[in-house]
Amino acid sequence: MGAACPRRPIGARILPMVIYCFDPERGRRWTERLTGIRPQFACVLGFTETALIPGISAAGLTPEARRFTALGDGEVLLAGRSARLPSAPEGYPSPVVISRAVVELLGLPVRVFDAGLPETCKDAVHLGGSPARCLSTGRALAPDTVAHLFSQGLAWGERLADEGGYLAIGECVAGGTTTALAVLRALGHAADGLVSSSHPRCNHTQKGALVDLALQKADLPIDASALAILAALGDPAQPAIAGMAIAASHRVPVLLAGGTQMLAVAAVAERLAAEAGLGWRPEQIAVGTTRWVAADPTADAALLAARIGVVPLLAAALDFSHSRHPALQAYERGYVKEGVGAGGLAIAAELAGIDSERLLAAIDDWLDRWNLPTPV
């Protein structure tokens, strides 16, 4: 396992909910600049048929339900309601409950982007992408689609940076930790056994075998471009988020709100920026996840971040042990862990001055309201 994730002070002020997991010096500098500032939040939704493989993901009650996980999360983010709250097979709720609670608590501006869903998300910004085929095909996305999504991400990154503050970017892609593993391996990073998942124990053997098959089918040359890697093995959210992060980071700090999937985005963004001659500002970027990912005994996010070596990894020390909802207490047993920007937004709440007790109360209160009738 990699290095532990110690808690660190920032100057005279201690941020008790922020854990610095990799590159703590850069992480402290990044958070110090943003204390007292609220972000704008962008969440990119996508779908990969990889999610339909039984057992590959727990981001949905059934494999078929995973077609609509991102749709439900997007609806909750935008409206606070959905016809269905996505949940794990055991019934534990999506981490969107954390994200939406922070959005309401801080009054954050939210944009949801549809990079490629099977069904349209109402009120989302449509980027003109498409769902990905299963990565086992070695032809997940059309190269033109990847290039278009990257271009759209760049354009939106510039536009969002114009609005000031800093930008937190989340994602929702069921099966996305597996596409992340595939992209990381194709980029040359030793990521096997390190990625997290929505399962309480990560299904490394299943993921690894699928990625082995995908790499064999893709038959990428050793000098394959980042766009070619994403076309062969990726999902539609990855090029869009990478473009957003690259463009926005030229002007404002960027928080990639997620775990394994956002570490993969950071790695591919570095390569994309170099190949496109766009300039790379890693000092402007941090990845922010949850303690449940950082402390996952069946993965190692800190070691993965160190092997990638691109940006600091932070984690929110959010604790559901004392939640009044047993379904949230299950997060402490390794279920769900992260998604929809949950960890990064919990860090944003801390930076904005919200303590852990107030944040937990807001999340509990939000889930209390979930069963109320939908307003007409």
UniProtKB/Swiss-Prot annotation:
Highest rank taxon of the organism: Bacteria
Disulfide links within the chain: none
CDD domains: DMB-PRT_CobT
Alphabetized GO MF terms: nicotinate-nucleotide-dimethylbenzimidazole phosphoribosyltransferase activity
Family indicated by similarity: Belongs to the UPF0284 family.
This protein's name: UPF0284 protein glr4139
Organism: Gloeobacter violaceus (strain ATCC 29082 / PCC 7421)
